[in-house]
Regions:
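Short amphipathic alpha-helix that is part of the acyltransferase structural core
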Residues: 2-8, 105-146
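Conserved active-site alpha-helix within GNAT-family acetyltransferase domains
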Residues: 7-10, 73-88, 208, 233-251
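Acyl-donor-binding surface of acyltransferase catalytic domains
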Residues: 16, 39-118
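A conserved beta-turn-beta hairpin within the catalytic core of GNAT-like acetyltransferases
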Residues: 30-40, 180-192, 202, 225
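A short, internal acetyl-CoA/4′-phosphopantetheine-binding micro-motif in the GNAT/acyltransferase core
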Residues: 38-49, 193-203, 231-232
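Conserved acetyl-CoA-binding loop-helix of GNAT-fold acetyltransferases
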Residues: 49-57, 194-197, 203-218, 239-244
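Conserved catalytic-core motifs of GNAT/GCN5-like acyltransferases
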Residues: 87-98, 230, 246-262
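A conserved beta-strand-loop-helix scaffold within acyl/acetyltransferase catalytic domains
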Residues: 141-197
């Protein structure tokens, strides 16, 4: 358990979800049916037989996420979860193979961070004030961080980077982390994203560069060469950024079951 050593991030509701997720993860982390990169415990794959399991996750955690639900199963799954009293949302999954590393290298070789910005890779020496600044920034931009233990605890396979201006204010972020069990078929694929850029600095390619640098760090430090992310349907800027780094929609979605009572 956390025991105050590591922080939870996001809104008060998100922190409650992360606290619940950490406790659940201690119980089931050796079961490859489940996965987690530090924000919530998920089911690794969606099929008819695990709908009730997803509902149970939602009731225990506040949300129950099922990754990689094929398009033909989404409506049946949504209907079944709604009949259990849960609210349901979905996001499109974008995936990229090892060509993403080639794309990331091309981006990094062609771009530089604006001279007034400082690039920081979050580690155990990062000050609490910087972490708190990143937390507030990502909350404001709807891109919540993984819990601190998944970012900084020894042995965790993750990367979080930020760009700061001359006043120490956060301008952009990106993060990625191991998601699947080591025995899962997709164990070499990391969750990537959590991208955000300050409004007055958009259009300068900062998010693209940070996203590429994050991928390369995950590859160099932890050996990942495949990545996936979840994008809300119609989020054209995110879709375009994904395309530049070699991630494409693959006809699956993340289905999110939400316990409405948790947020009251």
């Amino acid at each position: 358990m956390n025991q105050g050593e590591y922080a939870y991030f996001g809104s008060s509701d998100n922190q409650r979800i992360q606290r619940n997720a950490e406790a659940i993860w201690e119980l089931i982390r050796n079961d490859p049916r489940f996965c987690c990169h530090g924000r919530a415990v998920s089911l690794a794959k969606g099929f008819e037989e695990n709908i009730q399991l997803q509902a149970s996750l939602a009731l225990l955690q506040g949300v129950g996420i099922c990754d990689s639900v094929p398009s033909w199963h989404i409506e049946n799954r949504r209907s079944a979860l709604e009949k259990l009293g849960l609210r349901v949302e979905q996001m499109e999954i974008f995936r990229g193979g090892n060509h993403t590393i080639t794309s990331a290298r091309s981006v990094v070789s062609a771009r530089n961070l604006p001279e007034d910005l400082e690039l920081i890779y979050i580690d155990e020496d990062t000050s609490k004030s910087v972490l708190q600044g990143i937390d507030a920034f990502t909350q404001y931009h709807g891109a919540s961080l993984p819990m601190e233990s998944f970012l900084l605890k020894p042995g965790r396979r993750s990367v979080c980077i930020t760009a700061l201006d001359g006043h120490g204010n956060v301008v952009g972020t990106s993060a990625a982390g191991a998601h699947f069990h080591r025995n899962h078929a997709r164990c070499d694929e990391a969750f990537w994203g959590m991208l955000a850029t300050r409004e007055d600095r958009r259009g300068q390619g900062i998010a693209l560069l940070l996203g590429a640098l994050c991928m390369l760090a995950m590859n160099e430090r932890h050996g990942f060469d495949k990545f996936f992310t979840a994008v809300k349907k119609g989020n054209t800027p995110s879709e375009r950024l994904c395309a530049k780094l070699g991630l494409k929609p693959n006809d699956t979605s993340a289905v999110i079951a939400i316990d409405p009572d948790f947020f009251q």
